[in-house]
């Protein structure tokens, strides 16, 4: 597979994929928009505190690698960025809406169970049931041009196995296990996090609207 992203590159691409679906009126994103999305405290694991300079360096690298492209339309003085990571006109990686939702959530939060993914990806795609989540994960894991995700060994005491994306290379399961947050009520936590993300995005939309009205 030709994808070998750093953790920060994965965060940038994940943010652009997410905002393309959840806040299309604000997409493509400016550098400031990408910084805000990367450092968002909801629906991010781990939470990052990237500077504008750090994000700009990642954007420049990803443009050179043809994973992003710059957009500067007529009358638009601010350079904006859109993803060419998947489903672009000349790109090779074609994903369904369900696959985009799962890949994005894995890029933004790392290894997760199917139950967590269903809840956290719901703003991008409404999965009808757990079977749809699991079948989508299996397709991503068995694609001829992939695999793009891998099923991890089930941890002791856990009911579900977690899945991880492979866009940053092979997975070190030991480090993932030691860094995995402990939660006795993971499904409830996932639903709360999804609601927090919706509130954060509504606030972001309101701030953007107020700023636009004040111009």
From Swiss-Prot:
It comes from Salmonella typhimurium (strain LT2 / SGSC1412 / ATCC 700720). Belongs to the UPF0502 family. SUPFAM superfamilies: Winged helix' DNA-binding domain. Disulfide bonds: none annotated. Pfam families: DUF480. This is UPF0502 protein YceH. InterPro entries: DUF480, WH-like_DNA-bd_sf, WH_DNA-bd_sf.
């Amino acid at each position: 597979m030709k994808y070998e992203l750093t953790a920060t590159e994965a965060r940038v691409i994940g943010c652009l994929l997410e905002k393309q679906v959840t806040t299309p009126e604000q997409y493509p994103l400016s550098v400031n928009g990408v910084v805000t999305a990367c450092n968002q405290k909801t629906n991010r694991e781990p939470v990052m505190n990237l500077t504008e300079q750090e994000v700009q360096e990642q954007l420049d690298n990803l443009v050179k690698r043809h994973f992003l492209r710059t957009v500067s339309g007529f009358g638009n003085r601010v350079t904006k960025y859109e993803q060419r990571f998947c489903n672009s006109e000349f790109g090779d990686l074609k994903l369904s809406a369900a696959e985009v939702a799962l890949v994005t959530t894995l890029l933004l939060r790392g290894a997760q169970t199917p139950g967590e993914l269903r809840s956290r990806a719901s703003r991008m795609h409404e999965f009808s049931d757990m079977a749809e989540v699991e079948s989508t994960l299996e397709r991503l894991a068995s694609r001829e041009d992939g695999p793009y995700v891998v099923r991890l060994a089930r941890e002791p005491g856990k009911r579900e196995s977690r899945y991880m994306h492979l866009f940053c290379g092979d997975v070190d399961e030991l480090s993932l296990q030691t860094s995995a947050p402990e939660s006795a009520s993971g499904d409830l936590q996932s639903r709360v996090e999804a609601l927090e993300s919706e509130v954060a995005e509504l606030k972001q939309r309101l701030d953007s609207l107020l700023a636009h009205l004040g111009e």
